[in-house]
A protein has these predicted regions:
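Conserved beta-strand segments of alpha/beta enzyme cores
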Residues: 20, 51-53, 97
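Short beta->alpha connector loops
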Residues: 3-6, 58-61, 82-84, 245
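Donor/substrate-binding cores of folate-linked one-carbon enzymes
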Residues: 17, 27, 76-195
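An anion-binding loop in the catalytic cleft
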Residues: 209-301
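Acyl-group handling in specialized metabolite and lipid biosynthesis
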Residues: 197-210
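N-terminal Rossmann-like dinucleotide-binding module
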Residues: 1-35
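N-terminal glycine-/serine-/threonine-rich beta1-alpha1-beta2 phosphate-ribose binding loop
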Residues: 27, 31-75
Length: 301
């Protein structure tokens, strides 16, 4: 059970490992782009390419989905970014239970956006957790954990791709352990949990009175959506790549330099943040130096 690109890696690994996939559950087709043409989820596209049976129930709690799951007789349910809450009746159907591929080091960052919040909070390390699913969100017993460092320049989109592959590897190892009877479950430390709520569009607006490090993490953590944004010379731009520089005596929000190296803006902690890549409204993503050719900025002396 899964929907976005993140889940494709896990499904692909199960197929490559030779497991029988009795059914693939994914969210219903959604309108996409301006034409509002219905589009398949990435999981559905991959499943159909492999000749797998795809199911897209609109509700999981009305009894129809439960009847369908029971009809399929799964030995194990695997969930990866499905985007739906599963009732206990479904979770308890398979003899081996239901497990989830979660993109954080539980109990930290339970919830919908763990990858984004790890970067927003400036974490240096993250990973994936394979856990049993329980009634409470992301609170089930842990079966397997794999860790990885977060590069200071890595954004959420790039980290998601890496964790998808790491999650697929962890899932493969976990399923083999379950099959062999060697899996060990560890109860989460519920007193240590943190929550990673859904992102909102207003989170993208840059407040230059914040520290340069905070804004740098905001830029990285909100890619590809909603993206950090700010006004430069009266025009709103999305900011995609930055780096923290040295100290300045200029007021927060002041453009201290603008040239081939990028656009340097003063932040609330007295440091500069250099904008390296941005996207103007209605335009493409580009280097800040290219943007300046058509949009010169006034630099405060």
């Amino acid at each position: 059970m899964g929907t976005p690109d993140f889940a494709v890696a896990s499904l692909k690994r199960l197929v490559e490992d030779g497991h029988e996939i009795c059914g693939v559950f994914t969210q219903p087709d959604r309108p996409k782009n301006r034409g509002h043409k219905l589009a398949f989820s990435p999981v559905k596209e991959y499943a159909l390419s492999q000749g797998l049976s795809v199911y897209q129930p609109t509700k999981m709690r009305d009894g129809t989905a439960l009847a369908l799951v029971r009809e399929l007789h799964p030995e194990l349910i695997v969930v990866a970014a499905y985007g739906r809450i599963l009732p206990e009746d479904i979770l308890n159907t398979p003899p081996y239970g239901s497990i989830n591929v979660h993109s954080s080091l539980l109990p930290k960052y339970r919830g919908a956006a763990p990858i984004n919040w790890a970067i927003l909070n400036g974490e240096r390390e993250t990973g994936v957790t394979i856990m049993y699913m329980a009634k409470e969100l992301d609170a089930g017993d842990i079966l397997h954990v794999m860790k990885t460092d977060i590069d200071p320049q890595e954004d959420a989109q790039a980290l998601t791709a890496r964790l998808a592959e790491l999650g697929a590897q962890a899932l493969s190892e976990t399923v083999e352990q379950l099959r062999a009877g060697t899996a060990h479950r560890t109860v989460q430390d519920h007193s240590a949990y943190t929550y990673a709520p859904m992102l909102t569009k207003d989170m993208g607006v840059i407040d230059w009175t914040k520290t340069a490090g905070h804004i740098h993490n905001q830029v990285r953590g909100l890619i590809p959506w909603p993206c950090a944004s700010t006004e430069l010379g009266g025009a709103t731009v999305k900011v995609f790549r930055t780096e923290v520089l040295g100290e300045t005596g200029k007021a927060p929000g002041t453009v201290a330099a603008a040239g081939k190296a990028g656009i340097d803006v003063a932040c609330g902690d007295g440091h500069l943040l250099r904008i390296l890549e941005l996207q103007p409204q209605g335009g493409r993503r580009m280097a800040a130096a290219d943007y300046l050719r058509g949009h010169p900025l006034q630099v405060e002396a």
